[in-house]
Amino acid sequence: MASEGDKMLGGRFVGSTDPVMEMLSASITIDQRLAEVDIQGSMAYAKALEKAGILSKSELEKTLSGLEKISEEWSKGVFVVTPTDEDIHTANERRLKELIGDIAGKLHTGRSRNDQVVTDLKLFMKNSLSVISTHLLQLIKTLVERAAIEVDVILPGYTHLQKTQPIRWSQFLLSHAVALTRDSERLGEIKKRINILPLGSGALAGNPLEIDRELLRSELDFASISLNSMDAVRQRDSVVEFLSVAALLMIHLSKMAEDLIIYSTSEFGFLTLSDTYCTGSSVMPQKKNPDSLELIRSKAGRVFGRLAAILMVLKGLPSTYNKDLQEDKEAVFDVVDTLNAVLQVATGVISTLQINKENMEKALSPEILSSDLALYLVHKGMPFRQAHVASGKAVHLAESKGITLNNLSLDDLKSISPLFGSDVSQVFNVVNSVEQYTALGGTAKSSVTAQIEQLRELLKRHKEQA
């Protein structure tokens, strides 16, 4: 328990803090992940203080040297956290004083933990977004390149988990890749708003020392400077935006995981997951559990929970800084870690799974060509609504006879519509079926190939911006 004299900010207090209160308030076990960016911010601020005449050149040199020593201790894992270290800021400042003496007390001149912590968090998020973007782009690339290799593989498409129309396996892969490109774009968009410097805003009223904020911006590599000091220290829009984008990304990853889980079941048998990403059963030795995909699916709920929690924290706060905002960092750290792990595992799953072409072909039952039968009649001049009814009658007739749709005789079909001719047999060919969909975005080979090329170009642009 810290005594009155041990408190870094304890000048106006009498007595000791309740140890339970100290435990509740302390965040050092969580926010020590900000150690390096906190030091970066302090180095930049020390230079600004020297320019403002608060630090002499000699004091600046000692301060920077001390901060470099602290950075080295953190990187080597030898920094010692003490019971009086409430958070990463007080820990670093306490250690700096041990190294360079009372000069360390000048470093916080004109600076508040309010603008310090939000600067640290933004620096952390900038770095993290770059890493997440790299992992996301690698996953998209893996999907796209696999689609290019397996472009001739055809399987049933599904709605309501029922067979609908034949599609290319590549069309399925690209459907997920395209969704993920939007997530990549959103990550780039929020990075622009994160890239605004809050340091120099003080507690809420601004900085009274004519601190050169342009110097701070340049030193910390921010794109611009916050316009209003009160808004700068209170805003956690960037946290909410990041968690929101993360939640949407996890929806897309969860959906992909669910599809692959279904396709990998013995009932479907469309693909086999690598043993690297599966586990066995503790009771049933024949089982191969898709744990990797199930964990991806479940982690989506974890991210949603973090977003919901921070929204509830923020919704009723008055202006500027409140201690409630301490909750933001744990949410960000957890979601950053979750995304990095999930994206890498998803990439591994996609790159190592094996498709079972025979099972995909076996699942291409003639009934999934009933819409093609309707299109056949449309090409013969029948309005689509009538053609749809006629095709449905053909399906019903085949079911009542206990045969497949393609085994109906020409007489059977003519009993439904005289427009059916001997060329109707061409309808019952899955390659012909998928090749009808040549419009941009369709499942014809030419369209799929065009999608692949467009996505490759998009990946190049996103990689340059990451």
Swiss-Prot record:
| Pathway(s) annotated for this protein in UniProt | Amino-acid biosynthesis; L-arginine biosynthesis; L-arginine from L-ornithine and carbamoyl phosphate: step 3/3
Tissue localization of expression is: Eye lens.
Name the UniProt record assigns to this protein = Argininosuccinate lyase
Instruction: Output the PTM entry.
Output: The N-terminus is blocked.
User: According to UniProt, where does the site described as Increases basicity of active site His lie?
Assistant: E294
Q: What EC number(s) is this enzyme filed under?
A: 4.3.2.1
Q: What one GO molecular function would you report for this record?
A: structural constituent of eye lens
| Native source species | Columba livia
Q: Where does 2-(N(omega)-L-arginino)succinate bind?
A: S27, N114, T159, N289, Y321, Q326, K329
User: What SUPFAM superfamilies is this protein classified in?
Assistant: L-aspartase-like (SSF48557)
Query: What is the organism lineage in this UniProt record?
Result: Eukaryota, Metazoa, Chordata, Craniata, Vertebrata
Which NCBIfam families does the UniProt record give?
argH (TIGR00838)
Instruction: Answer yes or no on keyword Lyase.
Output: yes
Q: Tell me the keywords, alphabetical order.
A: Amino-acid biosynthesis, Arginine biosynthesis, Eye lens protein, Lyase
Protein purpose: Delta crystallin, the principal crystallin in embryonic lens, is found only in birds and reptiles. This protein also functions as an enzymatically active argininosuccinate lyase, but it has a low activity.
Instruction: List the GO cellular component terms.
Output: cytosol
